[in-house]
Every structure is written in structure tokens, then in C-alpha cells.
């Protein structure tokens, strides 16, 4: 993923009243519980699960009830319970593109503010790789139906 002075990004933060470890676990191992599966998918049918393999280089994908899998990206950094970085391999048409030069990055930091208080800071950067459609993709990801809504659902699931 290319970065530079023209980096186009979405920044979101949410405070959750759970431990740092729980926040990390819900974000990574229980994404199915909070992701908008009906609308935020790339397969033909509503998936039954969102899977993130828990290691650097791991796959991040959706799995349909019939076992069909559609890749979304890769785990770039796996540092529980403090940090997760993902390469998002979806293009401007929300289809998988395996070319790493066209991926964007999702950087999530889980900052412990107490034993049962965690600040989750998410940055989805590199959106300029979408060229002429960069602003369109940014607007979608920056909308209430994008990371804001997803993180609100994450916060509910973490409780």
C-alpha cells in the first residue's frame, strides 16, 4: 500500500468499557457479531461468518453457508492486545483485488485506559489508490454506514 503526502484516510475512535484484551478479541475473533453482513459483503449470498486468521500473513475473508469463501484482505500486523493492521484488498467496486499496490490499510490500536476501559483508534488509510474514485470510496467509508456505524456495532458487541 502506497503512502505519502496525498494520503487519503478515515480516522475513527471509540471508547469501550471493556479490557484491552476483550476489545481486541471482539474486534478480531468475533467480527461476525458486529459486521453488517447483509450489506457489507462481496459474495453473492449473505455470509455466515467473517474470519480473520490470527497471525501476520493470515487471511481476512467472509464465508458463506455453503462454505464458499471471498477474500477481503490480509493481516499485516498481529500484536494482541494492542494493535492490528490489515491490508484491505477491495477495489472501488467493492471487489477483491489481490494486487498489494492497490490495497488500503486499516490500522487499529487498542489503548488501555484502565482495567475495564479501552480506547480503540482506527485509521483506514491509502484510499488514494482508488484514483479517480478515491473521493467516492472515502465518502462511503467515512459515512454513518461506514466505519462510524461499524464501530458503534462493535462497541455494542464488546459489552
Where are these regions (language model features)?
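Hydrophobic ligand-binding cavity/cleft-lining segments
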Residues: 1-46
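Intrinsic-disorder/low-complexity, polar/charged segments enriched in Ser/Thr/Lys/Arg/Asp/Glu/Gln
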Residues: 7-15, 59, 70, 83, ...
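Hydrophobic/aromatic beta-strand elements that line small-molecule binding cavities or substrate pockets
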Residues: 12-14, 50, 72-77, 103-112
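A short, structured loop/turn motif at beta-sheet edges
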Residues: 17-21, 76-84, 109-119, 156-159
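Hydrophobic pocket/interface hotspot
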Residues: 23-27, 60, 75, 86, ...
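Short beta-edge strand/loop motif at the mouth of beta-sheet-based domains
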Residues: 30-72
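Residue-level recognition of conserved beta-strand positions in structured domain cores
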Residues: 64, 88, 122-124
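Beta-strand/loop substructures that line and gate deep hydrophobic ligand-binding cavities in soluble
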Residues: 94-145
Amino acid at each position: 500500500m502506497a503512502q505519502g503526502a496525498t494520503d487519503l484516510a478515515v480516522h475513527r475512535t471509540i471508547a469501550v468499557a471493556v479490557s484491552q484484551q476483550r476489545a481486541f478479541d471482539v474486534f478480531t475473533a468475533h467480527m461476525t457479531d458486529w459486521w453488517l453482513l447483509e450489506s457489507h459483503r462481496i459474495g453473492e449470498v449473505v455470509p455466515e461468518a467473517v474470519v480473520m486468521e490470527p497471525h501476520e500473513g493470515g487471511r481476512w475473508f467472509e464465508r458463506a453457508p455453503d462454505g464458499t469463501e471471498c477474500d477481503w484482505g490480509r493481516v499485516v500486523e498481529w500484536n494482541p492486545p494492542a494493535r492490528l493492521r490489515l491490508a484491505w484488498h477491495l477495489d472501488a467496486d467493492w471487489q477483491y483485488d489481490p494486487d498489494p499496490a492497490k490495497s488500503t490499510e486499516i490500522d487499529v490500536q487498542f489503548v488501555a485506559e484502565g482495567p475495564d476501559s479501552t480506547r480503540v483508534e482506527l485509521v483506514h488509510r491509502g484510499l488514494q489508490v482508488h484514483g479517480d474514485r478515491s473521493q467516492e470510496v472515502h465518502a462511503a467509508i467515512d459515512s454513518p454506514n461506514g466505519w462510524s456505524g461499524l464501530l458503534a456495532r462493535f462497541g455494542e458487541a464488546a459489552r
